[in-house]
């Protein structure tokens, strides 16, 4: 760390640079993609582009999100994953057009999540995974339009009943939390009969240790299969034609899906 306790100086984003990073999505949305650019401070110049529909600031080194982010009143999709953010501003509750919020892989604690999140009445996907949450924010129980919630890889010991009562919840990831009862997460998921508890990820998006564990599990499964009788069996997932075509496309669709597809 530099003298005086200051962190590394990140890349400076000018208005012209930001304008050149605007892309039009397949469904006609304006997306500002500033991911993986070494940004350490929220670039205030982008507030002049408040008509964008989607904002991607993921995989940078941003520590603080300013209250002024609420100027993005048309924003439907906000991706802040993989930064150093330890709290969200109260003003985020004013961004009532949000459908998708990803703040996974940051430094968020439960106290760093403002109660104003309960004002996001239209939001459908919230990813809070890979943070330091020791309890589930009660605000989530007020978000009746939620379809997908990520709470994996935190410090959770219990899940409130209000989550199970979310009427439109379809996907919930609560894996790798220190639940006192090892079966608690499975029991909770099973209690929501409508839940689709399936998560896909591409190899390029996994850390080396996770990838190694998955490969070991796959090798073990292949060994078991090779020892089993070779009688013809009906495929469990007939739509997964090949691992390098249909399945890969499905994985990419899940990872990059726009809120407009919900």
Curated annotation (Swiss-Prot):
Please name one Pfam family that this protein belongs to.
Answer: LRR_14
Q: Does the keyword Phosphoprotein apply?
A: no
Q: In which tissues is it expressed?
A: Exclusively expressed in spermatocytes and roud spermatids within seminiferous tubules during spermatogenesis.
Main localization, broad class: cytoplasm
What this protein is reported to do is described as: May be involved in the regulation of spermatogenesis and sperm maturation.
Which conditions up-regulate this protein?
Up-regulated during sexual maturation and dowm-regulated by experimental cryptorchidism and heat stress.
What does the entry list under GO cellular component? cytoplasm
Q: Which named protein is this?
A: Leucine-rich repeat-containing protein 18
Source organism: Mus musculus (Mouse)
């Amino acid at each position: 760390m530099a003298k005086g306790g200051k962190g590394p100086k990140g890349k400076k984003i000018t208005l012209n640079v930001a304008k050149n990073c605007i892309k039009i999505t397949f469904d006609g949305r304006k997306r500002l993609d500033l991911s993986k650019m070494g940004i350490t401070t929220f670039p205030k110049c982008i507030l002049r582009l408040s008509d964008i529909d989607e904002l991607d600031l993921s995989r940078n080194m941003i520590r603080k999100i300013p209250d002024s982010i609420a100027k993005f009143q048309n924003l439907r999709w906000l991706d802040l994953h993989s930064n150093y953010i330890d709290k969200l501003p109260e003003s985020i509750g004013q961004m009532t057009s949000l459908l998708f919020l990803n703040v996974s892989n940051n430094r968020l604690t439960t106290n760093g999540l403002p109660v104003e999140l309960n004002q996001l009445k239209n939001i459908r996907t919230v990813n809070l995974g890979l943070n330091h949450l020791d309890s589930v924010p009660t605000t989530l129980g007020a978000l009746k339009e939620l379809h997908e919630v990520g709470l994996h890889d935190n410090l959770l010991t219990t899940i409130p009943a209000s989550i199970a009562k979310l009427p439109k919840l379809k996907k919930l990831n609560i894996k790798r939390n220190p639940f006192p009862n090892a079966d608690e997460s499975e029991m909770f998921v099973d209690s929501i009969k409508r839940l689709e508890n399936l998560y896909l990820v591409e190899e390029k998006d996994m850390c080396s240790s996770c990838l190694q564990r998955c490969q070991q599990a796959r090798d073990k499964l292949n060994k078991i299969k090779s020892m089993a009788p070779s009688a013809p069996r009906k495929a469990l997932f007939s739509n997964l034609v090949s691992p390098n075509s249909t399945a890969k496309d499905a994985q990419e669709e899940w990872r990059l899906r726009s809120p407009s597809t919900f």
